[in-house]
Amino acid sequence: MKRALISVSDKNGIVPFAEKLVELGVEIISTGGTKAAFEQAGVPVTGIEEVTEFPEMLDGRVKTLHPAIHGGLLARRDTAEHMEAIAAHDIKPIDLVVVNLYPFQETIQKSGVTLEEAIENIDIGGPSMLRSAAKNYAAVTVVVDTVDYDTVLTELEEHGATTFETRQRLAAKVFRHTAAYDALIAEYLTNITGETFPEKVTLTYNRKQVLRYGENPHQDAAFYTEPGTVENSISSAKQLHGKELSYNNIRDADAALKIASEFTEPVAVAVKHMNPCGVGVGENIEEAYLKAYEADETSIFGGIVALNKEVDAKTAEHMSKIFLEIIIAPSFSEEAFAILTKKKNIRLLTVPFAGSVKGFEKTSVNGGLLIQASDSVIEDTASYEVVTEKQPTEAEMKALIAQWKIVKHVKSNAIVVGSDKQTLGIGAGQMNRIGSALIALEQAGEKAKGAVLASDAFFPMDDTVEAAAKAGITAIIQPGGSIKDKESIAMANKYGISMVLTHVRHFKH
């Protein structure tokens, strides 16, 4: 290796890296701020303009876009015609390229960033050099990540060159990196234009964790996250204690967070297998947790609990009495943290809460991807329609709205029985609505008397209303829209139940 081109925005570790290259007899070519950093550190360096014999122009937009650079990168060393061509133009081969790109992601995440600032942080020369070097990885080593500096130096010291396998791996890394960089720019500009579903979608995610296994032990898995911070998201969670999250932990935590984010009042949500098993609302977080626990004392064991307020010592004392996989909250008091961390394996996570989840959901199918707006429609309760002779009381209406927030997060067909303070019975994922209703009512038992019932979709028959009435339900909330709505309304009137239609369906598959 004789010649290296180095141009980086992230200068961490670059000076000692270059110093070692010089010790190994490598000539350093550099640009702008990187060149200045080398000169200040006393590292021998050749300016890019000395190689191209052309000055930087357009405020630095054009520096390395020159045949003297790309010819030196792309020339195949095993092809005589290539080597003769660059020699004829006095172009020297470049054997190592170290480049990281303008911080576009960091720029667009700044508060108040302008379009002009974003545009100026779109790197052109950097990706071009990286791609040229990566294409010719048979002869050229290309580095885009500071973590690879040591590998390159070790191989140079031991062999005088990098191995083919290392060059190939680094080239693949470069193409992933530039593809992700371009995808981020495309997404940013697409959002500005207001296009919702463009003809092509390129998604970029960063690997956060290689998981022990997936949903089952025979399935390999990893966790990838979107660039930047996403509020109300497990991807932005900070783990304070406990062992690593599993695949199932992450999915359950995501489900719990979505429900907890629906409420502004203190709420505790217990989840098992992506369905809530108990949700409690209270004047304070202790009361909320106790209501969630009482909702289903059996299923909460080994579950995940999400709370939308700081966990205090009293709440922590209650939670420490049972086995919980994960507790998620905006924060933990010092006393609560001390109590909970006595359990070695419990995972404690903090997540920033900021209202219900918005944006888009992505679901893979075999050979494709479904994208839809999140089910975060803002519903105006004033538009809800009471269709029965009996009007819901103020207390019943409060309970109906609370359970309506919950039922949208239960796998369809979904029925939730509850009060204004807690769920009492949850029927999830049955192939017919009456099946889910019977499960929820059976779970609620005697507590169903005086409770309310929420259904994520309309009643195809009046059987659910009749079953609810016989169990003691006093009010029902559902979207309506069935051709047999009149029969369900008539059944409600027969038993003196109030029924509210929201005209919004909340299927969850």
From Swiss-Prot:
It comes from the Bacteria. Pathway: Purine metabolism; IMP biosynthesis via de novo pathway; 5-formamido-1-(5-phospho-D-ribosyl)imidazole-4-carboxamide from 5-amino-1-(5-phospho-D-ribosyl)imidazole-4-carboxamide (10-formyl THF route): step 1/1; Purine metabolism; IMP biosynthesis via de novo pathway; IMP from 5-formamido-1-(5-phospho-D-ribosyl)imidazole-4-carboxamide: step 1/1. Keywords: Hydrolase, Multifunctional enzyme, Purine biosynthesis, Transferase. Coiled coil: none annotated. SUPFAM superfamilies: Cytidine deaminase-like, Methylglyoxal synthase-like. CDD domains: IMPCH. Its EC number is 2.1.2.3, 3.5.4.10. PROSITE patterns: MGS. InterPro entries: AICAR_Tfase_dup_dom_sf (IPR024051), Cytidine_deaminase-like (IPR016193), MGS-like_dom (IPR011607), MGS-like_dom_sf (IPR036914), PurH-like (IPR002695). The keyword Transferase applies. GO terms for molecular function: IMP cyclohydrolase activity; phosphoribosylaminoimidazolecarboxamide formyltransferase activity. GO terms for cellular component: cytosol. The keyword Hydrolase applies. GO terms for biological process: 'de novo' IMP biosynthetic process. The IMP cyclohydrolase activity resides in the N-terminal region. Belongs to the PurH family. This is Bifunctional purine biosynthesis protein PurH. It comes from Listeria monocytogenes serotype 4a (strain HCC23).
